[in-house]
Amino acid sequence: MTLILPKDYHPSLTIRDTEAAIVFIRENFQDKIADKLNLQRMSAPMFVEKSTGLNDNLNGIERPVAFDMKAMPDDTIEVVHSLAKWKRLALKRYGFGMHEGLYTNMNAIRRDEDLDNFHSIYVDQWDWEKIIAKEERNIETLKTTVKQIFKAIKETEKELSARYPGSTYRLPSDITFITTQELEDRWPDLAPEEREDKIAKEKKAVFLMKIGDKLKRSGKPHDGRAPDYDDWELNGDLLFWYEPLKRKIEISSMGIRVSEESLKEQLKKAHTEERSDLPFHKMLLEGKLPYTIGGGIGQSRLCMLLLGKAHIGEVQASIWPPEMIESCKAADIKIL
């Protein structure tokens, strides 16, 4: 997606009022999500050792920011892309019990991100993970959890609207569940991104399930997913139709995590079976890690959505190409 400059856009809040609203959204939403999912806030790393295999490989082509450190010259340190695998290990290390979980304020750098209205090299999200029983690894558990997150977003919207009545973007009351295969069957000639826009415009709020495995018609995945955290049959993305930009906006990517069996199967499909020898993967394959559900919820994305902003740079401080900054300035988009 390229930069979209909506016509007649004018922010309804000053920069300082926007900053106050951001704090209000963040504090309210994280309290609600912690309560609904039984999560405890925990400290999280900004970087991990490459040798542990704990970093998120995303689609497998993005380069992590990496460096060495004086005290450990023989190892490469990587800035995290996300904490998808770290959280599952942390639940075991910190002694969390059944149906207990954690959330973190995760900050990441994704240097290879294609920049546009929704995407920045700086990623901030609530990364969360919760222990479930093996028999709870099913679609119903996934849907129930999505509904709890959706409810937390709606409650935050209501409270924000009471404080900033003219500056809150209105969200739909209900959410629709649909699979990537159903989208391909309905619109086989469209690209995956176009299908997402179509269904989001039609339903307004959608949880798109089963991302990562090959689709039947095209023989290609709807979108890339690393093989070693989400179970591709039990995951999905939370999407909203965003009228100011006339596009869908993804607020969360989440899923029930791989079991020993599905990890083995997905590593094979992804031709990355060598990861089986990494410490995290060994523990998982040996049944030493709890079964979990987890995901990431974009902090800046949620603020952008609820405040009706035209660019994510209005709700977070990052680095943008000079020509993008100039184009935004001309369109009254106030980049921080």
UniProtKB/Swiss-Prot annotation:
Catalytic reactions on record: L-aspartate + NH4(+) + ATP = L-asparagine + AMP + diphosphate + H(+)
InterPro entries: aa-tRNA-synth_II, aa-tRNA-synth_II/BPL/LPL, AsnA
Pathway participation: Amino-acid biosynthesis; L-asparagine biosynthesis; L-asparagine from L-aspartate (ammonia route): step 1/1
Subcellular location: Cytoplasm
One GO CC annotation: cytosol
Top enzyme category: ligase
Entry's Gene Ontology molecular function annotations: aspartate-ammonia ligase activity; ATP binding; catalytic activity, acting on a protein; transferase activity
Biological-process GO terms, alphabetical: L-asparagine biosynthetic process
Gene3D superfamilies, per the entry: Bira Bifunctional Protein, Domain 2
This protein's UniProt keywords: Amino-acid biosynthesis, Asparagine biosynthesis, ATP-binding, Cytoplasm, Ligase, Nucleotide-binding
Enzyme Commission number: 6.3.1.1
Family the UniProt entry places it in: Belongs to the class-II aminoacyl-tRNA synthetase family. AsnA subfamily.
Protein name as annotated: Aspartate--ammonia ligase
Originating organism: Lactobacillus johnsonii (strain CNCM I-12250 / La1 / NCC 533)
Gene: asnA
